[in-house]
C-alpha cells in the first residue's frame, strides 16, 4: 500500500510516463488488476491511447474508468446495485412535487419555485451539497454563519427544507449519482476487483470530499495509488500558502492526499519528477515553451527572438473574429497539411460565438463539433412542437 505522485509541467509527458509504466507492469504481472481513473469525458480517448500504445494492442488487465463507472462496477460485483439510480430529470420531477407539498414552509423560494428552470437550480445546489458530503443537518452551521436574519440565511433554510424532504423521499427507494461514491466506500472491502490492484489517476486538478474519501479507502485496500499532478519545479508541491497562488489547486490536492495517506498509515513514495526543459510538448516551439515558463510569473522577462508560434489579430466584431479563424484553419489544412482533428477553437463565451462559428464554418466547409449544451426549447424542432401544441389547444378551446 503506497501513494506516489508524478510531477511535471503541462506538456512534460506525465500521462505518457504513466501509461507506459502501467502497460509494462500489466504485462509483467497479468494477475494484477490495473485501473486508470480519468474524468468521465476522457475515458474513451484514454482507452484508445492505451490500445494503440500497447505492444499487443489489447488491455486485458487494464480498466479505464471514471469514479462513477468504477462505483457501478464495484456495486454490481458486490451485489449492491439493486437500488434504482435517479437521473437529473427524475430529481427535477421529485423536487417539483415536494415543492408543492412544502410550499407553505418556504419563505423565499415560494414565489420563485414555479419559474422555468428554478427547480433545476435547486437540484444543482442539492447535488453539490451531496458531493461535498454536507447533510441537511450540516447546513445549520452555514445558516448560522450567514446571519440568521439575512436573506441568504432564509434562502438556505428553504434549501434545507427541500433537501430534507428530498432525502426522506429517496430513503430505500433510489440513490442519486452523487451518493454512489459514498456507498462505494462502504463496500470497497468486499471487492475482489480492487483488492491488491494498482490505481492510476490522470487528468484531475482536484477532488471533492467524497472522492477523497474513496481515495482513502483505495489507499487502504489497493496495492498502490499513482497520480499525475501539474507542477512547476520552482514550486514546493507539499506547501500550500494560499488559495490564490500559482498551482494552488495542485498543491491543495497533494497536501490533502498526503494527509489522507498519513491517516491511513500509508507510505508516500519518492515522486517521479518530469521537469526537463524545454517541456516535450513545446520542444519545437521555443516561443510557446517560454510562454509556458513565464506566464503569470511577472518576472519581467521578454522573448526577443523572431517567432511565428503566437499571433495576435484584432477584429471589429465576433463575426470577423470567427471569419479570421476560419481563414487561418483553411490555410493550415491546405498549405501546412494539418488535419481537422489537430485544431481546436477556444471561445470566451459560447453564447456569443456559437452561432457565428457554426454559420461561418459551414460557409468555409469546415467540419466542427460544438462542445456546449444547447437549449432544446430554442431548437427548430422544439419551436415547431410547441407551436403545434399551441395551435391544437386553441382549436380544442374554440370547439368546446
Task: Give the residues covered by each predicted segment.
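Helicase P-loop NTPase motor core
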Residues: 1-4, 10-26, 32, 40, ...
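Accessory N-terminal region flanking or inserted into the helicase ATPase core
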Residues: 2-6, 14-17, 101-203, 210, ...
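A short acidic, amphipathic alpha-helical/loop segment
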Residues: 21, 50, 211-217, 356-360
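Conserved P-loop NTPase-based nucleic-acid remodeling module centered on helicase motor cores
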Residues: 31-140, 150
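Conserved beta-strand -> loop -> alpha-helix junction used to position metal-binding or nucleic-acid-contacting
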Residues: 37-49, 55-76, 90-91, 229-234, ...
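A polyampholytic, Gly/Pro-enriched intrinsically disordered region
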Residues: 79-99, 293-295, 385-400
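Conserved Walker B
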Residues: 203-205, 350
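Extended, H/D-rich, highly charged conserved domains that either
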Residues: 206-279
Amino acid at each position: 500500500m503506497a501513494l506516489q505522485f508524478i510531477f511535471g509541467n503541462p506538456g512534460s509527458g506525465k500521462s505518457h510516463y504513466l501509461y507506459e509504466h502501467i502497460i509494462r507492469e500489466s504485462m509483467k504481472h497479468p494477475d494484477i488488476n490495473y485501473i486508470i481513473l480519468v474524468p468521465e469525458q476522457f475515458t474513451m480517448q484514454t482507452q484508445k491511447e492505451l490500445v494503440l500504445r500497447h505492444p499487443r494492442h489489447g488491455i486485458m488487465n487494464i480498466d479505464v474508468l471514471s469514479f462513477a463507472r468504477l462505483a457501478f462496477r464495484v456495486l454490481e460485483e458486490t451485489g449492491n446495485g439493486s437500488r434504482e439510480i435517479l437521473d437529473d430529470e427524475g430529481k427535477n420531477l421529485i423536487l417539483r412535487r415536494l415543492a408543492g407539498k412544502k410550499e407553505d414552509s418556504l419563505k423565499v423560494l415560494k414565489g420563485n419555485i414555479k419559474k422555468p428552470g428554478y427547480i433545476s437550480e435547486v437540484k444543482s445546489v442539492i447535488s453539490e451539497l451531496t458531493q461535498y458530503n454536507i447533510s441537511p443537518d450540516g447546513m445549520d452551521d452555514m445558516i448560522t454563519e450567514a446571519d440568521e436574519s439575512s436573506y441568504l440565511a432564509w434562502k438556505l433554510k428553504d434549501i434545507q427544507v427541500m433537501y430534507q424532504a428530498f432525502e426522506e423521499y429517496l430513503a430505500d427507494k433510489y440513490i442519486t449519482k452523487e451518493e454512489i461514491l459514498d456507498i462505494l466506500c462502504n463496500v470497497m472491502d468486499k471487492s475482489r476487483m480492487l483488492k491488491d490492484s494498482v490505481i492510476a489517476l490522470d487528468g484531475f486538478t482536484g477532488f471533492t470530499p467524497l472522492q477523497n474519501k474513496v481515495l482513502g479507502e483505495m489507499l487502504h485496500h489497493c496495492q498502490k495509488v499513482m497520480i499525475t499532478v501539474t507542477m512547476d519545479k520552482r514550486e514546493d508541491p507539499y506547501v500550500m500558502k494560499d488559495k490564490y497562488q500559482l498551482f494552488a489547486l495542485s498543491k491543495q490536492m497533494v497536501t490533502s492526499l498526503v494527509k489522507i495517506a498519513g491517516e491511513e498509515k500509508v507510505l508516500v513514495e519518492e515522486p517521479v519528477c518530469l521537469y526537463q526543459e524545454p517541456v516535450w510538448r513545446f520542444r519545437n516551439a521555443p516561443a510557446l515553451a517560454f510562454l509556458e515558463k513565464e506566464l503569470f510569473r511577472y518576472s519581467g522577462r521578454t522573448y526577443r527572438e523572431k517567432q511565428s508560434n503566437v499571433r495576435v489579430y484584432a477584429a471589429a466584431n465576433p463575426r470577423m473574429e470567427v471569419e479570421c479563424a476560419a481563414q487561418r484553419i483553411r490555410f493550415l489544412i491546405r498549405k501546412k497539411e494539418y488535419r481537422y482533428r489537430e485544431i481546436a477553437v477556444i471561445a470566451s463565451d459560447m453564447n456569443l460565438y456559437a452561432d457565428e462559428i457554426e454559420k461561418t464554418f459551414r460557409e468555409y466547409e469546415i467540419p466542427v463539433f460544438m462542445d456546449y449544451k444547447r437549449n432544446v426549447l430554442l431548437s427548430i424542432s422544439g419551436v415547431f412542437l410547441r407551436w403545434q401544441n399551441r395551435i391544437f389547444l386553441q382549436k380544442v378551446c374554440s370547439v368546446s
